[in-house]
A protein has these predicted regions:
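Re-entrant/interfacial helical elements at transmembrane boundaries that shape
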Residues: 48-61, 90-101
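Hydrophobic alpha-helical transmembrane segments of multi-pass integral membrane proteins
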Residues: 1-8, 24-57
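Alpha-helical transmembrane segments of multi-pass membrane proteins
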Residues: 28-42, 65-86
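Hydrophobic alpha-helical segments of integral membrane proteins
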Residues: 13, 17-28, 35, 57, ...
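Helix-coil boundary and interhelical linker segments in multi-pass alpha-helical membrane proteins
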Residues: 59, 63-70, 130-133
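Transmembrane helix-loop junctions in multi-pass membrane proteins
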Residues: 5-18, 43-46, 124-133
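Juxtamembrane and boundary regions of transmembrane helices in multi-pass small-molecule transporters
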Residues: 78-133
């Protein structure tokens, strides 16, 4: 993961993606930051890997949009923690331990995870607009 993230940064891919996200999301970007963190953790099964892959991206978008990178990166990390909880790798391990089916377990956990992400997105947005310009 680190190799991929470093390659993306050195090749300019991270900045290109950040520019596109900043143009697309604009001032609403803080609401999306936790979802990006959750996506990274969902894909990799790890909050740390999510931060490695998307940390530079989030920081670049924050700079382009003109908001506090500290709050955005806090949203990234908190979103990654939530996303890690319903990562398929973790669901498979848990279900194999208790001999349950993965599909129903993933659907049940996703409902709660998406609700928590929505609250986190609103919290991140509020923190930016109240404290973090």
């Amino acid at each position: 993961m680190v190799g991929m993230a470093v390659t993306m940064e050195h090749a300019g891919m991270t900045h290109l993606l950040a520019d596109g996200i900043a143009r697309l999301a604009g001032p609403a970007f803080p609401l999306a930051a936790p979802f990006i963190g959750a996506l990274g953790a969902f894909m990799t099964g790890s909050n740390t890997n999510s931060n490695v892959i998307f940390g530079d991206l989030q920081q670049s978008v924050a700079a382009l949009v003109g908001v506090s990178p500290l709050i955005i990166l806090a949203g990234q990390t908190a979103g990654g923690a939530i996303g890690s909880a319903f990562a398929p790798a973790k669901i498979i391990v848990g279900c194999s331990t208790v001999e349950a089916e993965e599909g129903p377990a993933l659907r049940a956990v996703m409902r709660y995870g998406l609700a928590m992400l929505a609250v986190l997105a609103l919290t991140t947005g509020a923190a930016i607009y109240l404290f973090g310009r």
